A protein has these predicted regions:
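Non-catalytic alpha-helical scaffolds and adjoining flexible linkers that form interface surfaces
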Residues: 1-248
Length: 248
């Protein structure tokens, strides 16, 4: 039978029978897939480490009726540092669940995979504030999934910048302070948060974390990013409550 060779990030692992696992894997060519990993729970298995949560591995897959079967796997990267703090692990689980919820199935998901790998690397190596990583993932993921906010200017008067702005969380348009006041909308972004919002949603992938933001602006950006993402999800994320308990 023909096999498929692909890189993939393990997003979930579920024990099945005595020594098997069912894996949920995010791949660049096939999107999110389910795969059976026979005997992968046996400690003597050469493939034991390749199947772990947040392991980025090369998989040799055999297509089946309902799911793939993993024939071989070799580890590329294990994000050990993710579990070095409860806050980091909580964030990783939240990003993981959002990726499973929003990434396509049966089609290309290279952008989604690169973003998640980048964020896990940033968490693992403590390269950025966890709230920055969270906001970047939420906003960029929403943008890639068809919910890119209308960030060019005020939706009414066309003003590009000001000391504050309002982002409509449902429709994704901006209002300047004057237009927001006329409609009774309280501004939820300051200038720094708006700059970061535009940067995250519009810049090329490799520069996505190349911005600076003040503590005050980050608080506004973080709140808007979270609310915007949760507004457009089909269902609540189970990991959200735990994340908020460790990273308010």
């Amino acid at each position: 039978m023909d096999t498929i060779v692909t890189m993939g990030l393990v997003l979930r692992e579920t024990r099945y029978k005595e020594a098997d696992r069912i894996l949920t894997i995010l791949t660049p060519e096939l999107g999110v897939i389910s795969a059976s990993a026979p005997n992968s729970l046996r400690l003597k298995s050469k493939l034991f480490s390749a199947y772990g949560l947040f392991c980025y591995s090369e998989f040799v897959l055999v297509p089946g009726r309902n799911m793939y079967t993993v024939r071989e796997a070799s580890v590329n990267t294990i994000f050990h540092g993710v579990s070095s703090s409860i806050e980091g692990m909580g964030l990783a689980m939240y990003l993981d669940e959002m990726a499973v919820s929003l990434s396509p199935t049966g089609t290309e998901a290279g952008k989604e995979l690169r973003l998640l790998l980048n964020c896990l690397y940033m968490i693992s190596r403590q390269k950025a504030d966890l709230r920055v990583i969270k906001a970047v993932f939420e906003l960029r993921t929403m943008s890639e999934c068809g919910f890119l906010p209308q960030l060019a200017c005020c939706n009414v008067c066309g003003k590009y910048d000001d000391a504050s702005f309002y982002l409509d969380l449902q429709e994704g348009y901006l209002l300047c302070p004057d237009c927001a006041q006329k409609t009774g909308k309280p501004c939820n972004l300051d200038a720094g948060a708006l700059y970061a919002l535009r940067h995250i949603c519009l810049v090329e992938d490799k520069k996505i974390f190349a911005f600076k933001i003040s503590v005050g602006s980050l608080a506004k950006l973080s709140a808007v990013a979270e609310q915007y993402a949760l507004t457009h999800l089909d269902k609540p994320l189970k990991s959200y409550s735990f994340l908020k308990s460790v990273l308010p």
